[in-house]
């Protein structure tokens, strides 16, 4: 059975789809026949408009990843059958607001895991980061963002161990291309966009 057949007609929740990776995920899901349901703090279709001609057709639900009640409401409304969790504040934002970023990155992740547990969702992936593993000879984490991501991986492992909630964590390294205009690895994309002008 192909992936497109498995996903056709199914609603997949994408948190953080206003970002670069999320926009590309929404585009791919549409092409596979799935129904992407974007959950983000603000409706910003700028990156979607950059890469897909039918960006307005994507369902967009406003909400804060730290609001579990709102997440549950969206999941019930759209009969969500899969989750791709990408919502997070990146390195510079974590450094600027340690408490707020921990609330979003860590509490947001536990809310997604709990949503999957309560709704019986068995198709879930989440973005970790190459920043998650310890670096150097002393096994230290270089950023608070990395600490958030390793925490997310550990919480996902416990949700599997204690409640059999399956998930797949992905550790992207350098992200570049259309739509990548924030974060530590945005410079190549920003330079390419500037060169096109």
Positions of PLM-derived features:
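NAD(P)H-binding glycine-rich loop region in Rossmannoid oxidoreductase-like domains
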Residues: 65-103, 135
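Conserved Rossmann-fold NAD(P)-dependent oxidoreductase catalytic core, especially the SDR/UDP-sugar
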Residues: 85, 103, 107-146
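N-terminal Rossmann/SDR dinucleotide-binding element
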Residues: 1-82
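Residues at the starts of beta-strands that form the adenosine-phosphate
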Residues: 35-37, 122-123, 166
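NAD(P)-dependent short-chain dehydrogenase/reductase
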Residues: 18, 144, 157-197
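Structural signature of the Rossmann-like NAD(P)-dependent dehydrogenase/reductase core
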Residues: 14-15, 85, 123-126, 168-174
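Conserved active-site helix of classical SDR/Rossmann-fold NAD(P)-dependent CH-OH oxidoreductases
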Residues: 27, 109-110, 150-157, 161, ...
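Active-site segment of SDR-like NAD(P)-dependent oxidoreductases
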Residues: 89-91, 130-134, 173-176
């Amino acid at each position: 059975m192909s992936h497109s057949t498995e996903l056709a007609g199914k609603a997949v929740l994408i948190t953080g789809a206003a970002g670069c990776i999320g926009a590309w995920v929404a585009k791919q899901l549409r092409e596979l026949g799935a129904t992407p349901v974007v959950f983000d703090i603000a409706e910003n279709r700028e990156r979607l408009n950059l890469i897909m001609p039918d960006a307005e057709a994507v369902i967009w639900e406003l909400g804060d990843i730290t609001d579990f009640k709102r997440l549950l409401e969206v999941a019930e409304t759209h009969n969500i059958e899969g989750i791709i969790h990408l919502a997070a504040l990146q390195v510079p934002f974590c450094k600027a607001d340690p408490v707020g970023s921990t609330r979003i990155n860590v509490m947001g992740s536990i809310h997604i895991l709990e949503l999957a547990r309560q709704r019986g969702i068995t198709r879930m992936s989440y973005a970790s980061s190459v920043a998650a593993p310890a670096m150097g000879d002393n096994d230290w984490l270089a950023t608070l963002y990395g600490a958030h991501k390793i925490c997310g991986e550990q919480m996902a492992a416990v949700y599997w161990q204690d409640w059999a909630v399956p998930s797949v964590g992905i550790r992207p390294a350098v992200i570049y291309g259309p739509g990548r205009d924030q974060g530590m690895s945005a410079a190549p994309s920003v330079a390419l966009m500037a060169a096109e002008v």
